[in-house]
Amino acid sequence: NCCPIDEESCCS
Protein backbone atom coordinates (compact mmCIF):
# COMPACT_ATOMS: atom_id res chain seq x y z
CA ASN A 1 0.00 0.00 0.00
CA CYS A 2 1.55 3.26 -1.09
CA CYS A 3 -1.38 5.33 0.10
CA PRO A 4 -3.62 5.31 3.21
CA ILE A 5 -6.30 3.84 1.00
CA ASP A 6 -5.96 1.08 -1.55
CA GLU A 7 -6.44 2.77 -4.91
CA GLU A 8 -5.14 1.61 -8.27
CA SER A 9 -4.40 5.22 -9.19
CA CYS A 10 -2.48 5.65 -5.98
CA CYS A 11 0.82 4.19 -7.13
CA SER A 12 0.10 4.17 -10.84
Swiss-Prot record:
List, in alphabetical order, the Gene Ontology terms for molecular function in this entry: toxin activity
> What domain comment accompanies this record?
The cysteine framework is V (CC-CC).
User: What modifications follow translation?
Assistant: Contains 2 disulfide bonds that can be either 'C1-C3, C2-C4' or 'C1-C4, C2-C3', since these disulfide connectivities have been observed for conotoxins with cysteine framework V (for examples, see AC P0DQQ7 and AC P81755).
Using the record's annotations, give every residue carrying the modification 4-carboxyglutamate: 7
Describe, from its UniProt entry, the tissues in which this protein is expressed.
Answer: Expressed by the venom duct.
Q: What is the lineage of its organism?
A: Eukaryota, Metazoa, Spiralia, Lophotrochozoa, Mollusca
Record's family? Answer: Belongs to the conotoxin T superfamily.
The GO cellular component terms are: extracellular region
The UniProt record lists the keyword Translocase: no
> Which organism does this record belong to?
Conus textile (Cloth-of-gold cone)
The reply to whether Hydrolase figures as a keyword in the UniProt entry is no
Name of the protein in its database record? Conotoxin tx5h
Q: Show which residues constitute the signal peptide.
A: none
What keywords would UniProt list here? Amidation, Disulfide bond, Gamma-carboxyglutamic acid, Secreted, Toxin
Q: Where located? A: Secreted
